[in-house]
C-alpha cells in the first residue's frame, strides 16, 4: 500500500452563522461554517411553521371556475 496518500484528518470547529453555536468534529478541512445548525433549525427546535395552502387552493379553484365558465359561454 502507498504511504501518506490520505489527507490530514484533524479536529475542527463547526460554526453556525445563524445562532453562533460552535461544536467540534473531525474533518480534512480547516474550518467549517454552516448557515443553520440543529440548535436553530425549526424542525429540531419545534418552532416549525406549517404553510397554509387552503387560501391558494381556493383562489386557484375560483380562477379555474371563471375560465371554464367563459369557455362554456363561448361554445
From Swiss-Prot:
Protein purpose: Binds the 23S rRNA.
* Family statement: Belongs to the bacterial ribosomal protein bL31 family. Type A subfamily.
Q: How does it assemble?
A: Part of the 50S ribosomal subunit.
- Keyword Flavoprotein attached: no
* NCBIfam families linked to this entry: L31, PRK00019.1, PRK00528.1
Alphabetic keyword roster: Ribonucleoprotein, Ribosomal protein, RNA-binding, rRNA-binding
Swiss-Prot/TrEMBL GO biological process terms = translation
Matches recorded under InterPro entries: Ribosomal_bL28/bL31-like_sf, Ribosomal_bL31, Ribosomal_bL31_A, Ribosomal_bL31_sf
Q: Which GO terms describe its molecular function?
A: rRNA binding; structural constituent of ribosome
Its gene name is rpmE
Q: What is this protein called?
A: Large ribosomal subunit protein bL31
Q: What would be one Gene Ontology cellular-component term for the protein?
A: ribosome
Amino acid at each position: 500500500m502507498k504511504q501518506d496518500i490520505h489527507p490530514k484528518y484533524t479536529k475542527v470547529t463547526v460554526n453556525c452563522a445563524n445562532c453562533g453555536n460552535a461544536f467540534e468534529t473531525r474533518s480534512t478541512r480547516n474550518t467549517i461554517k454552516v448557515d443553520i445548525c440543529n440548535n436553530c433549525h425549526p424542525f429540531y427546535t419545534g418552532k416549525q411553521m406549517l404553510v397554509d395552502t387552503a387560501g391558494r387552493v381556493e383562489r386557484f379553484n375560483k380562477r379555474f371556475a371563471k375560465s371554464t365558465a367563459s369557455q362554456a359561454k363561448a361554445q
